[in-house]
Amino acid sequence: MGRDTIADIITSIRNVDMNRKGTVRIESTNMAEKIVKILLREGFIENVRKHQENKKSFLVLTLRHRRNRKGPSP
């Protein structure tokens, strides 16, 4: 059984957004970078930076603040 990278990325972003957090960190892969580039261009993400920790690369995404979103209060 393989991993569904696209679903994992979207789910991570959705979970962080629903919990009203500002940033999410995902593993940096070629596919993840391409997906994030599209989300950035479409306005779902405000900023992206690459972070390296213990020889592993991550993408740190700053989510765009949305009004009237449902989810738990801070």
Curated annotation (Swiss-Prot):
UniProt keyword annotation of rRNA-binding present: yes
Residues spanning the signal sequence: none
Main location: plastid
Keyword set, alphabetical order: Chloroplast, Plastid, Ribonucleoprotein, Ribosomal protein, RNA-binding, rRNA-binding
GO biological process, one term: translation
Cystine crosslinks: none
Pfam families per record: Ribosomal_S8 (PF00410)
Highest taxon, organism lineage: Eukaryota
Location(s) in or outside the cell: Plastid, Chloroplast
One annotated Gene Ontology cellular component of this protein: ribonucleoprotein complex
Job of this protein: One of the primary rRNA binding proteins, it binds directly to 16S rRNA central domain where it helps coordinate assembly of the platform of the 30S subunit.
This protein's name: Small ribosomal subunit protein uS8c
Source organism (scientific name): Oenothera ammophila
Taxonomy of the source species: Eukaryota, Viridiplantae, Streptophyta, Embryophyta, Tracheophyta
Gene: rps8
